[in-house]
Amino acid sequence: MALVSTAPLASKSCLHKSLISSTHELKALSRTIPALGMSRRGKSITPSISMSSTTVVTDDGVRRRMGDFHSNLWDDDVIQSLPTAYEEKSYLERAEKLIGEVKNMFNSMSLEDGELMSPLNDLIQRLWIVDSLERLGIHRHFKDEIKSALDYVYSYWGENGIGCGRESVVTDLNSTALGLRTLRLHGYPVSSDVFKAFKGQNGQFSCSENIQTDEEIRGVLNLFRASLIAFPGEKIMDEAEIFSTKYLKEALQKIPVSSLSREIGDVLEYGWHTYLPRLEARNYIQVFGQDTENTKSYVKSKKLLELAKLEFNIFQSLQKRELESLVRWWKESGFPEMTFCRHRHVEYYTLASCIAFEPQHSGFRLGFAKTCHLITVLDDMYDTFGTVDELELFTATMKRWDPSSIDCLPEYMKGVYIAVYDTVNEMAREAEEAQGRDTLTYAREAWEAYIDSYMQEARWIATGYLPSFDEYYENGKVSCGHRISALQPILTMDIPFPDHILKEVDFPSKLNDLACAILRLRGDTRCYKADRARGEEASSISCYMKDNPGVSEEDALDHINAMISDVIKGLNWELLKPDINVPISAKKHAFDIARAFHYGYKYRDGYSVANVETKSLVTRTLLESVPL
C-alpha cells in the first residue's frame, strides 16, 4: 500500500542541484570548510572559551555562536537509582486482583446492596468512576466497561444536560459539566448549549453569593474542566471558563486547606492542555478519596487508589530498562562529545512517558526521545554553531541519504549525520514490523522538509533578513519539529495507520497543522528574547511587529496569545469531531505530543532551561515512587 507523500525525494543522482551537481563538486565544496568539532568515534575539538559566552572561536579559527545552555542533568548514577522493587510477582498479582475487583464494580453498577441503584444518582456514579479511572491513569484496563457506562449516561442526555440520576427532575451542574467533558472526550456529540440552563436572567453564570458547600464548588470545578474542551465558536465555553476561574480562585481564599483545595490548585495551574496524564495521575493520587464520607464510596475509592499506586510504581521498573537503552544509544552515537548542543534525552523520554505509559508502547517512548534529541542537536547546529556554507553542505548530504557521502562533511557534522541516519532507519524497521509496510520513504520526505526549513532560517540569521509574519509562520510550523517528532514514533505503535487515517494525522492534515502551529507560537512567546540575544531576530512576535508598524511588543504578544487560544480550540475539534473513519485513538498520541511540548513551554523554554519545572517533572514521574 502506497504511503501518502507530498513531495518527491531528492535522488542520489540529483543532490540539491541548486547547490551541488556532483559528488566531485560536493567534495570540492567540503575542502573550503575546515574540519572541526567531533567525529562519531573521534575526539572533540573544544571551544577555546567558556560555554557561557554566545560567541566562541574554535581551535580552527572559525568564529561561532553557541547557546548558554546548562549541561545534562542526569548521569548514570541517577538512572541506576530508579526503583525496581515493584516488578516483584506479589505486586503484579495484587494489581491483577484489583483490576478484577474494579471490573466487578462496573458489573454491579446498577445495584446497591442488592437493590437497584437509585435512579437519582446512577448517572453521576458512572461518571465518577470513569473520571476517577482516567485521572488516576488506570483506565486502559477498563475500555469495554467505560464504553458501557458512557453509553448508559449518553442515553439519558438531554438538551439541558442531565441530573444526578436517570429520574432526576432538575438538571445538575456537576453532573452536566462532568458529563459533557467526559462524553466529549470519548467522541459523543454533546452540545455546550446545555450550559445555558445554568445562567441567570441576566445571561450570566451564577452561584450563591457566599461559597457554601463542597458540592457547589465541585460543580464549578467540573464546569472549568469542561470549558477547556471548547470547540471553535463556542462563546458559552469562554464565558464558563471566565466565570469558573474567578469563582475557584475566590474559593481558594475562603475554604480551608484540604484535598479539594489542592485539587482545585492543580487544575487551575495546569488546565488540560498542559496537564500531562502521568503528572495528573501523580498529583491526583495524593488527593483522591480523602473527602469521601460514605462508607461504600470509601471502599471503592480505596481499591482504585491502591491500584493506581501499584500501576504507577510498577511502570517505573520498565522506565529504568528503557532509560538504560536510551542512554546507551546516546553514548554510542557520540553525543557526550558534542559540546555545542543541549542534551535533553532524559527529559524527552519523561515527556513521552507522561503521555503514553502503556507498557506495550516502548517503541513510541524511545522513538520520541531519540527523535526529539536529534531535533535539539540539529536546532543548535543550524541556529548557532554551524556556518551557512557548512549547513548548505549538510542539508545536501542529508537529502542524498547515503553514509558514504559524509567524507565531505566537517568532522562535527559526521556524527550528527550518522546519528540521524541510523536512528531514522532503525525506527523505520520498527514501524514496518508494526504497520506491515515500508515507511522509510515517507519518513525521509518529512525529514527533508524539516531540514529545508532549518536551512531557510539559517539563511535569515546569516543575512539579517526579517521575513513577513506569514512567511515566518509557514516555515516555522515545519521547523518546530512536531511532525517528525510524532510521525515515526506513532507508526511503531499497535495502532493501524492505513493511508486514509495517516493523512488525517500527519501532514497535510489540519490536526498536524494546528499542532505545529501551537508549538511554533507558544515556543516563540517563551524563547524570542533569548533567541534575539543570540542574534536570531525572526520570531512570530518580531515578524508581526514588522508587518504592523507601531504595534508594541506587548500588543504583539497579546495577538499571538489570542492566536494560540484559537488554535487550541481548533485542535480540540480536530481530535474530537465525529468521524467514523478516523477514531480518536488514532489521533490521540499526535495530539498529546502537542500537549507535551506545550507543557515544556508553560513557564519558560523548558528545553533550554530544564533545571526548574522540567526537572521537577522528571523527579515526580520518573524517579520518585508513590508510597503505598
Curated annotation (Swiss-Prot):
Q: Where is this motif: DDXXD motif?
A: 379-383
| One Pfam family from the record | Terpene_synth
Database matches in PANTHER family: OS04G0344100 PROTEIN-RELATED, TERPENE SYNTHASE 11-RELATED
What this protein is called in its record is: Pinene synthase, chloroplastic
Task: Give EC number(s), comma-separated.
Answer: 4.2.3.119, 4.2.3.120
Specify the transit peptide boundaries: 1-36
> Which catalytic reaction applies to this protein?
(2E)-geranyl diphosphate = (1S,5S)-alpha-pinene + diphosphate; (2E)-geranyl diphosphate = (1S,5S)-beta-pinene + diphosphate
State the function annotated in the UniProt record.
Involved in defensive oleoresin formation in conifers in response to insect attack or other injury. Involved in monoterpene (C10) olefins biosynthesis. A mixture of alpha- and beta-pinene is produced by this enzyme.
Induction or repression: By wounding.
Q: Report whether Secreted shows up as a keyword of the record.
A: no
Location relative to the cell: Plastid, Chloroplast
UniProt: Mg(2+) 2 binding residues: 379, 383
Q: Name one GO molecular function term.
A: pinene synthase activity
What does the entry's cofactor note say about binding and number? Binds 3 Mg(2+) or Mn(2+) ions per subunit.
| Entry cofactors | Mg(2+); Mn(2+); K(+)
Binding of Mg(2+) 3 occurs at 531
Broad class of enzyme this protein falls into: lyase
The UniProt entry's GO CC annotations, sorted and at most eight, read: chloroplast
The record makes one more remark, namely: The conserved 64-Arg-Arg-65 motif may play a role in the isomerization step of the terpenoid cyclization reaction sequence.
The biological pathway it contributes to is:
Terpene metabolism; oleoresin biosynthesis
Native source species: Abies grandis (Grand fir)
Q: Which family does it belong to?
A: Belongs to the terpene synthase family. Tpsd subfamily.
Q: Name one GO biological process term.
A: diterpenoid biosynthetic process
**Could you tell me the keywords of this UniProt record?**
Chloroplast, Lyase, Magnesium, Manganese, Metal-binding, Plastid, Transit peptide
Q: What is known of its domains?
A: The Asp-Asp-Xaa-Xaa-Asp/Glu (DDXXD/E) motif is important for the catalytic activity, presumably through binding to Mg(2+).
